[in-house]
C-alpha cells in the first residue's frame, strides 16, 4: 500500500490502488472524527473510493464513490450510510443515508454538432442530513450545492446547423418544508431556437420555450 494525495486521478492515466491521506474533522453536531479513504482502481476506465469514518460519539459512516468513463459517457455515483446516529428529536440511534448520482451521455447523433443526455439523482432520508454531515462528506462534483434543496431529473441538448433544442424534467425537494409542500415538479420543459433566414445585417431567428 502507499499514500497519495486526496484527489480523483485522471481516468486516462494508469492508476494504482492504495490508501489516501487520512482526514481529521471536528463538527458541532458530530464531534471529532477520522476518515481513512482507500482508492481502488477497478480497470482503466473505472475506479472507486471507499471512505470509512469513525466518530468519537460512536457514530460510524461509510461513503463510497464510483466513477466510470467510457468513450461517449461518464457515470459518477456516491452512496453514504451512517449507523448509530442519535437524532435530537427522539434521542434514539438511527441510520441515515444519501445517494447522489450523475450520468452524462454523448448520443453522437449523425447530423448534429452536439447531442447530449444527462440524468441526475439527489436523495437523503433525513431532512437535516446534508447540514449535519456536510463537513464529513468527501468533496465531489455531484454533492448538492444547496443543503436545503435536492434536484433529480434529466436534461438533453441537441444542436445542428439549423436549430437547437434543449429540455428535460426536474423534481425539486425543499427539505425545509413539510411533506405536503416540499416537492416541485417541472416537466416537461423545453427551449427551441431555429435560424430562419440570414441577411447582410443580421439573422432572423425563431425562439420558443415553455414548461408545464
Where are these predicted regions, by residue range?
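Outer-membrane beta-barrel proteins and related beta-barrel translocases across Gram-negative bacteria
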Residues: 1-212
